[in-house]
């Protein structure tokens, strides 16, 4: 199973967030080809500003693997991680992050900040932007509805 497959699983999570009126971002963590956690943005539901999809996916993966480090794991997420999530990925020692839309306003990987390329950090997370039109479309649709007060 390739990147596109995993990004589409993450996209299904993003759609679940959309249905709940959350900013539609979904994330999954994969280890050796197996999905070990899935999450979607739950800031509204949990009343928690840090409940981004990536944070929830990291926590769930650590619980499942009973470890604080996610070495050898990859995170697939529908939107470029923000600064908080990028640094959480560094702390988790995850191997790589793959994202399918850019966040021009808050991106922590390449669009605004470059947290993962920071040479002073003691763990280097590899990253890849793998564009998926559906991922950006879902976000545009959400913000359009928000502007028109449909959500
Ligand atoms: Zn985030």
Curated annotation (Swiss-Prot):
InterPro entries: APOBEC/CMP_deaminase_Zn-bd, CMP_dCMP_dom, Cytidine_deaminase-like, tRNA_aden_deaminase. GO terms for biological process: tRNA wobble adenosine to inosine editing. Its EC number is 3.5.4.33. Pfam families: MafB19-deam. Gene3D superfamilies: Cytidine Deaminase, domain 2 (3.40.140.10). The keyword Chloroplast does not apply. Zn(2+) binds at residues 52, 82, 85. Its cofactor is Zn(2+). Residues 1-111 form the CMP/dCMP-type deaminase domain. It catalyses: adenosine(34) in tRNA + H2O + H(+) = inosine(34) in tRNA + NH4(+). Keywords: Hydrolase, Metal-binding, tRNA processing, Zinc. Binds 1 zinc ion per subunit. The active site is at residue 54. It comes from the Bacteria. GO terms for molecular function: tRNA-specific adenosine-34 deaminase activity; zinc ion binding. It is an enzyme of class 3 (hydrolase). HAMAP family: tRNA_aden_deaminase. PANTHER family: CYTOSINE DEAMINASE FAMILY MEMBER, TRNA-SPECIFIC ADENOSINE DEAMINASE. Catalyzes the deamination of adenosine to inosine at the wobble position 34 of tRNA(Arg2). Homodimer. Belongs to the cytidine and deoxycytidylate deaminase family. This is tRNA-specific adenosine deaminase. It comes from Aquifex aeolicus (strain VF5).
């Amino acid at each position: 199973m390739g990147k596109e497959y995993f990004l589409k699983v993450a996209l299904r999570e993003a759609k679940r967030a959309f249905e709940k009126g959350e900013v539609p971002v979904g994330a999954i963590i994969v280890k050796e080809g197996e999905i070990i956690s899935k999450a979607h943005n739950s800031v509204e539901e949990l009343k928690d500003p840090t409940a981004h999809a990536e944070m929830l996916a990291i926590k769930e993966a650590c619980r499942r693997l009973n470890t604080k480090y996610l070495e050898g794991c990859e995170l697939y997420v529908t939107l470029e991680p923000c600064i908080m999530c990028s640094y959480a990925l560094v702390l988790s020692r995850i191997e790589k992050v793959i994202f399918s839309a850019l966040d021009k306003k808050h991106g922590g990987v390449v669009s605004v900040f470059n947290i993962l390329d920071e040479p002073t950090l003691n763990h280097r997370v590899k990253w890849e932007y793998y564009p998926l039109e559906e991922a950006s479309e879902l976000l545009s649709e959400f913000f359009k509805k928000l502007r028109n007060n449909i959500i």
